């Protein structure tokens, strides 16, 4: 069982199970989807550590109970209006981004790691938050990953950046359309960001082994120091 760790005001399972080194040198902070919690993604830790024995996985629970599932959590409210006017969620996303960044800073302090050793990723709503943090946040992570997510709002062009993104999506996603990630890729690249895009044929709203492999490869490249 992974241990539960609290950083800032967020808590969730922390996975680091290896006999090869004493403590992690890199961390993937992975944000769950709407109505789930951190335990939903913690099982990915073992697969990631087969690829990168020095990486830990921290899966914090969202800061608020899910409005449609009180047993789950959410990063921001996802009402029916969201699908017509997603930009209306931006003020709450900004507030949540501050909470996530404070947690990541506390994590780095505790593990004595620089932000360049951290990748922030997420699935579905968590992926939306990861893309938001990468384009509007202040915590300078090594990279940002969105799995079956979407980019909310306008991206400000950047003149020079080393920040990279991993964007993956199943072509048969019935919850968040595949086109959302294709649009995110286009908007990010137009703004000047580096994007690794992975389309997963016939995959619905989920994470398969190929996506996990792609995420692991991205984490490895992004955190090369």
Report residues per predicted region:
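Alpha/beta-hydrolase-fold catalytic nucleophile elbow
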Residues: 60-61, 121, 145-148, 168, ...
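C-terminal catalytic histidine-bearing segment of alpha/beta-hydrolase fold enzymes
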Residues: 179-225
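Short beta-strand/loop motif that positions the catalytic acidic residue
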Residues: 166-169, 173
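Active-site loop signature of alpha/beta-hydrolase-fold enzymes
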Residues: 36-37, 65-66, 152, 174, ...
């Amino acid at each position: 069982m992974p241990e539960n760790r609290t950083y800032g005001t967020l808590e969730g399972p922390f996975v680091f199970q290896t006999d090869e080194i004493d403590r992690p040198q890199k961390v993937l902070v992975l944000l769950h989807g709407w109505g789930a919690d951190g335990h939903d993604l913690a099982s990915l830790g073992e697969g990631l550590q087969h690829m990168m024995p020095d990486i830990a996985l921290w899966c914090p629970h969202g800061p608020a109970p899910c409005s449609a599932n009180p047993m789950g959590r959410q990063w921001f409210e996802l009402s029916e209006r969201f699908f017509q006017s997603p930009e209306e969620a931006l003020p709450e996303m900004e507030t949540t981004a501050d909470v996530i960044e404070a947690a990541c800073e506390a994590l780095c302090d505790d593990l004595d790691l620089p932000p360049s050793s951290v990748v922030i990723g997420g699935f579905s709503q968590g992926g939306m938050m990861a893309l938001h943090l990468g384009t509007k946040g202040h915590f300078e992570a090594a990279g940002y990953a969105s799995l079956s997510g979407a980019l909310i709002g306008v991206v400000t062009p950047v003149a020079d950046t080393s920040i990279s993104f991993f964007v993956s999506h199943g072509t048969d996603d019935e919850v968040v359309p595949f086109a959302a990630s294709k649009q995110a890729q286009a908007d990010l690249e137009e703004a000047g960001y580096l994007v690794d895009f992975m389309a997963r044929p016939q995959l619905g709203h989920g994470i398969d082994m190929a996506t996990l492999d792609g995420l692991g490869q991205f984490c490895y490249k992004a955190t090369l120091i």
